[in-house]
């Protein structure tokens, strides 16, 4: 390897080693000449690891120059590589031309992309440091290099070769540095992201897309939409996805709409493809659809005789005494074909009598036409249709019975039928469109029938629901009646219990009142007895004073009596006061007891009201749920 790449001077030992290990230009040319594009090496790719270039700090003499992305990095590719159905059958193929060196002629990209492969070059024993770079625009131009290398010795030639190899590695590194998948790298002269004001044709001529649309212009719409045709993505040019094949234009379109890298250029490609296909009057055929192979059948309308009629031939029987033909009557003809619901029958008569030509007229409706067509099909299945009659087939069964022939009537048949009729005796008819007279009404009948079936099913469903609701209502009504009876019994029992409790409470009240009255009476008797005792004692003291003999005794005795009376009055006053206090305390106790009683009674009423509310909540929702559930059955 030449040290000129690193900017240093080679030593003598390195020159000797280089002279012995580095091949000359002629050897390289011979090696390149032996390379064949159809060799077995083209079946796959060789993977090479990049060799570090900064060794020992000797990289100061070489500076890298940035390279702008250019669509020419793909080389001179054949246009058919974008739209040829046989291109790239293997996933390992690559459209980039292999890099190599020639002695006189410049290398160009092969026209057949299947033969693209990287040639194995002899590089002096050193492994390649980068993947295969894109082919140069004008090749390696070895002629000028070899011409300038002739005056030099072998070591100088080898050094030049190594310099070229170093330049090649630098170009590869710069090319790899270019492969940044962000949209920032695309803001160059090759791709303008501001395409809002550019016309469609101008956007198509963008160097990124020009080759693809040039290839599309050379193909027909059928060829473009071939599902097996393979495509490259031009927006992935120079990137890892450049070698990927997309089978069918739908796959390429999906890739362009969903790719997460180089978003702007991929979306631009999708828009241009859609616009191009729209201008061609087509669109992308989704996978699984066959394009342009079969054509559908169109409904062709026809004119039919209205009302529907069936011609019955060979209906005359024999000649009468006037030598005129007689034949089948109207009612007889209707009875013969009673299973086909004909409305009426007519026969054609001429100068010779019955012409053997009869008509079955059906209802002027789609059903009538279907019945007439069914009769005509019956004759066709038995080989007695119009063609058989016109071929003059057998007219009689074995044994002499006549064979009847029948077919749908057309205008010529009716005109023939009316040939000998005049005025009102002519059969009236009109020619109507089959689509308007039969197809549309039959279609409407089919739709009405489907709707009728739907309504019948809906009515049956509603009837089932109504029946279920009726049964549920009957059950709920019966349960409601039972509940009312049970509630009536409960209310009656509750009322009886209330009356019983009331009687018991009144009895208890009367009992306690009697007890209180007894206590009050006893108390009053004791008070009366106490007062009587006090009065008797006072009278006794007064009587004792009246029996004294002397005045002095009388006076002393009177003082004692007065003192006793005064003391007794004082005691009685204290008694009355204490009695009043005691009665007041008693009244307060009774009032407190009554207040406590009323409070407890109010609390009991509230508790009863709460329990009653809970009981009502317990049973009311259950009944409503049962009604709702029965209503939704």
Curated annotation (Swiss-Prot):
Comp. bias (Polar residues): 10-24, 56-67
Pfam families xref list: XS (PF03468), zf-XS (PF03470)
Recorded GO CC terms: perinuclear region of cytoplasm
Renumbered residue ranges of the record's region Disordered: 1-133, 147-193
Signal peptide: none
Coiled coil regions, renumbered to chain: 565-606
Biased composition range(s): Acidic residues: 170-193
Gene Ontology BP terms: defense response to virus; regulation of defense response to virus; regulatory ncRNA-mediated gene silencing
Record carries keyword Amino-acid biosynthesis: no
Keywords: Antiviral protein, Coiled coil, Cytoplasm, RNA-mediated gene silencing
Subunit structure: Interacts with begomoviruses protein V2.
Family indicated by similarity: Belongs to the SGS3 family.
Extra facts: Does not move between plant cells.
PANTHER family: PROTEIN SUPPRESSOR OF GENE SILENCING 3
Function: Required for post-transcriptional gene silencing and natural virus resistance.
Name of protein: Protein SUPPRESSOR OF GENE SILENCING 3
Protein's organism: Solanum lycopersicum (Tomato)
Lineage: Eukaryota, Viridiplantae, Streptophyta, Embryophyta, Tracheophyta
UniProt gene name: SGS3
């Amino acid at each position: 390897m030449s040290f000129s790449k690193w900017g240093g001077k080679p030593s003598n030992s390195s020159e000797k080693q280089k002279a012995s290990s580095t091949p000359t230009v002629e050897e390289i040319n011979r090696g390149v000449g032996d390379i064949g594009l159809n060799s077995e090496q083209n079946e796959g790719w060789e993977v090479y690891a990049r060799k570090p270039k900064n060794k020992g700090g000797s990289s100061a003499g070489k500076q890298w120059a940035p390279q702008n992305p250019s669509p020419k990095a793909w080389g001179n590719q054949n246009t058919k590589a974008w739209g040829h159905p046989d291109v790239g059958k293997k996933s390992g193929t690559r459209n980039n031309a292999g890099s190599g060196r020639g002695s006189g002629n410049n290398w160009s990209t092969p026209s057949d992309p299947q033969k693209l492969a990287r040639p194995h070059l002899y590089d002096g024993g050193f492994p390649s440091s980068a993947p295969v770079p894109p082919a140069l625009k004008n090749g390696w131009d070895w002629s000028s290099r070899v011409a300038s290398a002739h005056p030099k010795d072998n070591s100088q030639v080898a050094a030049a070769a190594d310099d070229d190899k170093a330049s090649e590695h630098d170009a590869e590194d710069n090319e790899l540095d270019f492969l940044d998948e962000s949209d920032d790298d695309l803001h160059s002269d090759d791709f303008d992201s501001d395409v809002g004001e550019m016309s469609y044709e101008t956007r198509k001529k963008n160097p990124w897309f020009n080759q693809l649309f040039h290839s599309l212009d050379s193909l027909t719409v059928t060829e473009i939409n071939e599902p097996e045709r393979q495509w490259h993505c031009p927006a992935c040019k120079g990137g890892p996805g450049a070698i990927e094949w997309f089978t069918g234009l739908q796959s390429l379109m999906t890739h362009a709409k969903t790719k997460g890298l180089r978003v702007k250029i991929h979306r631009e490609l999708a828009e241009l493809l859609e616009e191009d296909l729209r201008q061609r009057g087509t669109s992308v055929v989704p996978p699984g659809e066959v394009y342009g192979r079969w054509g559908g059948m169109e409904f062709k309308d026809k004119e039919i005789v209205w009302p529907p009629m069936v011609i019955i031939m060979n209906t005359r029987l024999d000649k009468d005494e006037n030598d005129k033909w007689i034949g089948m009557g109207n009612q007889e003809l209707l009875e013969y074909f009673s299973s086909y619901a004909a409305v009426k029958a007519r026969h054609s008569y001429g100068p010779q009598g019955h012409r053997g030509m009869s008509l079955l007229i059906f209802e002027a409706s789609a059903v009538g036409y279907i019945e007439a067509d069914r009769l005509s099909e019956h004759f066709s299945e038995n080989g007695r249709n119009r063609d058989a009659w016109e071929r003059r087939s057998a007219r009689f069964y074995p044994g002499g019975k006549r064979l009847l022939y029948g077919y749908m009537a057309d205008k010529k048949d009716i005109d023939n039928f009316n040939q000998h009729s005049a005025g009102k005796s002519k059969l009236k008819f009109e020619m109507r469109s089959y689509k308007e007279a039969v197809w549309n009404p039959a279609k409407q009948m089919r739709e009405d029938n489907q709707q009728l079936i739907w309504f019948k099913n809906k009515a049956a469903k509603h009837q089932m629901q109504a029946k279920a609701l009726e049964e549920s209502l009957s059950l709920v009504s019966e349960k409601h009646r039972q509940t009312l009876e049970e509630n009536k019994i409960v209310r009656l029992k509750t009322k009886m219990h209330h009356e019983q409790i009331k009687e018991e409470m009144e009895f208890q009240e009367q009992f306690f009142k009697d007890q209180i009255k007894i206590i009050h009476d006893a108390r009053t008797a004791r008070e009366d007895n106490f007062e009587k005792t006090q009065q008797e004692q006072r009278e006794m003291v007064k009587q004792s004073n009246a029996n004294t003999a002397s005045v002095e005794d009388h006076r002393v005795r009177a003082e004692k009596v007065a003192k006793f009376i005064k003391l007794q009055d004082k005691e009685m006053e204290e008694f009355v006061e204490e009695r009043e206090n005691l009665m007041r305390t008693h009244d307060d106790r009774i009032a407190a007891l009554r207040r406590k009683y009323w409070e407890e009674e109010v609390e009991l009423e509230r508790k009863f009201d709460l329990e009653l509310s809970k009981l009502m909540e317990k049973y009311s929702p259950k009944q409503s749920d049962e009604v709702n559930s029965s209503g939704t059955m």
